[in-house]
Design a protein with these regions (language model features):
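Conserved proline-anchored active-site loop of SAM-dependent methyltransferases
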Residues: 1, 10-17, 175-196
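RNA-interacting cores
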Residues: 161
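Conserved SAM/SAH-binding loop
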Residues: 167-172
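Class I S-adenosyl-L-methionine-dependent methyltransferase module
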Residues: 7, 14-157, 190, 194-225
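Conserved dinucleotide-binding and phosphotransfer motif residues
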Residues: 4
Length: 226
């Protein structure tokens, strides 16, 4: 509908979905990243930022500790295998750099959205899972051994005027919206998105929650579908 000139309002409870939606319906070109102080080397600043993040030195941080076979979870459970140790260290390095840029006011909301969207998409390609992040596979499969790489977003043409992205529960947001056409996705009561995609939510928020139990779930009850 955006490509046909309509204004679009999109909402979801999850933070990672918010970043996807901002990238998809509120942007039609790559952001400039004017406040990020890195050399561009004759490529666009956006590509330079991706190259910089892709080539960071690995960091043995939160993701390495909690979600890789080389780590030792804080709660004393056996090491988890959501990612290879190498990719977990890359995720840590990229997350910490994005967090540093946010703290220094170097990123606009759209720039933050694009980077976190790209990181989440890259993470999905190397995750050692069967479909969701409810649990990991016993052994690292082939795709999990591939290196994590941030790829540029292909921005699409279309209307971006008066588009809105809202994060919250549909039953609350519906009272604020007037629209000609509405699509409402039914809630997932048994397979809660907040639990099954907890790792993506942690990447989206840029935080360091307590990883609970054997699977390393974050506290997600405030986002559960009712």
């Amino acid at each position: 509908y955006r490509k046909r000139g309509y204004s679009v309002i999109a909402s979801d409870m999850m933070t990672y979905t918010k970043w996807h939606l901002i990238t998809q319906i509120m942007m039609d070109r790559e952001p400039r990243f004017e406040e990020v102080d890195i050399p561009s080397h004759h490529v666009s600043k956006y590509q330079a930022v991706l190259d910089y993040l892709n080539n960071l030195e690995p960091v043995e941080g939160y993701f390495f500790r909690e979600f890789s076979p080389g780590g030792t979870p804080a709660n004393g459970t056996a090491s988890r295998k959501y990612f290879s140790s190498e990719n977990a260290c890359k995720i840590d390095a990229i997350r910490e750099t994005i967090n540093k840029w946010i703290a220094s006011n170097c990123l606009s909301e759209q720039e933050e959205a694009v980077l976190k969207h790209s990181l989440i998409m890259a993470v999905n390609t190397v995750a050692n899972i069967s479909g969701t992040y409810g649990y990991y596979l016993a052994e690292l499969k082939k795709n999990a051994l591939e290196p994590l790489v941030l790829l540029p977003v292909r921005f699409s043409e279309g209307n971006i005027q008066n588009n809105r992205v809202i994060q919250g529960f549909a039953e609350d947001i519906a009272q604020e919206i007037t629209a000609d056409l509405c699509y409402i996705d039914p809630p997932y009561i048994k397979r809660q998105y907040a639990a099954n995609y907890h790792i993506l939510e942690t990447i989206a928020r840029g935080d360091y929650p307590e990883a609970q139990g054997k699977s390393g779930l974050r506290d997600w009850w405030d986002q559960h579908s009712k």
